[in-house]
């Protein structure tokens, strides 16, 4: 199954609280932190919520 490599590229300062909570739920704690998650609808939805703060790459 494919996986997603999610990298936080921008700071959450000034963002809404739900965006901060979503970043924390994804495991992102600061700029340039990366996590690898399974490619599932739950994670796709979280990434969509904070798409302006992160970059996403598909990893095999």
From Swiss-Prot:
Source domain of life: Bacteria
Annotated Gene3D superfamilies: Ribosomal protein L30, ferredoxin-like fold domain
GO cellular component: cytosolic large ribosomal subunit
GO BP annotations, alphabetical order: translation
GO molecular function, one term: structural constituent of ribosome
KW Oxidoreductase (keyword) present: no
Annotated keywords: Ribonucleoprotein, Ribosomal protein
Pfam families: Ribosomal_L30
Subunit and interaction comment: Part of the 50S ribosomal subunit.
Sequence similarity: Belongs to the universal ribosomal protein uL30 family.
Protein name: Large ribosomal subunit protein uL30
Species this chain originates from: Streptomyces avermitilis (strain ATCC 31267 / DSM 46492 / JCM 5070 / NBRC 14893 / NCIMB 12804 / NRRL 8165 / MA-4680)
Lineage: Bacteria, Bacillati, Actinomycetota, Actinomycetes, Kitasatosporales
């Amino acid at each position: 199954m494919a996986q997603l490599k999610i990298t936080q590229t921008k700071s959450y300062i000034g963002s809404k609280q739900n965006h901060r909570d979503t970043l924390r739920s994804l495991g992102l704690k600061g700029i340039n932190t990366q996590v690898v998650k399974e490619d599932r609808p739950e994670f796709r939805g979280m990434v969509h919520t904070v798409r302006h703060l992160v970059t996403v790459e598909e990893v095999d």
